[in-house]
Amino acid sequence: MKENEKVIMEKGIHTDFKENMTYGEYLQLDSLLSSQKRLSDHHDEMLFIVIHQASELWMKLILHELNAAIESIKQDKLQPAFKMLARVSKIQSQIIQSWDILATLTPSEYIEFRDSLGQASGFQSYQYRMIEYALGYKTPHALKIYEKDPELHARLHTALHAPSLYDVAIQALVKEGFPIHKDVLNRDITQPYEEDATVEAAWLEVYADVKKYWNLYQLAEKLIDIEDWLQQWRFRHMKTVERIIGHKMGTGGSSGVSYLKRVLDQRFFPELWNVRTKL
């Protein structure tokens, strides 16, 4: 060691792990970091794989928080739910940044390994589908995509039949005494939610008297945050796809950019957007 070289290792730092769990063992890094298996020899396929795997990890956390928030709202514990939903929004903002990295992939680079994907596509992401279900956008026909894996198909079937975040938010309105139409309360929750005048009237009253309905107002704003971030994610997705493959058909069989543009018009919480015009 050179005389002017400083020792940066503190005396108390643990170095003997013969009988103790290490950082890598706790995070199962051997398994995690060996999951990036390229199907081509092209350098940039690693970027493509890592971006999508990282997004799936973030989506796992989103589902963890959304499901917990739904249970909290069911139990009238809105304050803990607010923290969970705020965390979801932060995660969404993080995922959006990943499109900047993927956009460094040029069309010429992508076509070098695109055929290796076969028919695999982000459209088949079961976690993204479960997020849509948790937010209330139910698509029963999409379950066919997952028939290859019976266990996964069963999980999605359960998610399809579970009340969404918006379903429990509407129940919170009912508990506060708002008269919500019975057709909304008894609807088939396996189908996409359709806006309702009584739900809109309830939210309008919440926004008109924020002090009286503070918790419901906060819940509504948390929902708006999540949908806002999701729409930003969808827009960045669409523009990144357009930048890389133009208007070619997607690997999953969709029309590509044209399909992604149509998706931008989907609303999860329509009445919460409508009240902004009505106030």
Curated annotation (Swiss-Prot):
Catalytic activity field: L-tryptophan + O2 = N-formyl-L-kynurenine
Domain of life the protein comes from: Bacteria
EC class (word): oxidoreductase
UniProt xrefs under Pfam families: Trp_dioxygenase (PF03301)
UniProt entry keywords in alphabetical sequence: Dioxygenase, Heme, Iron, Metal-binding, Oxidoreductase, Tryptophan catabolism
Subunit structure: Homotetramer.
Protein name listed in UniProt: Tryptophan 2,3-dioxygenase
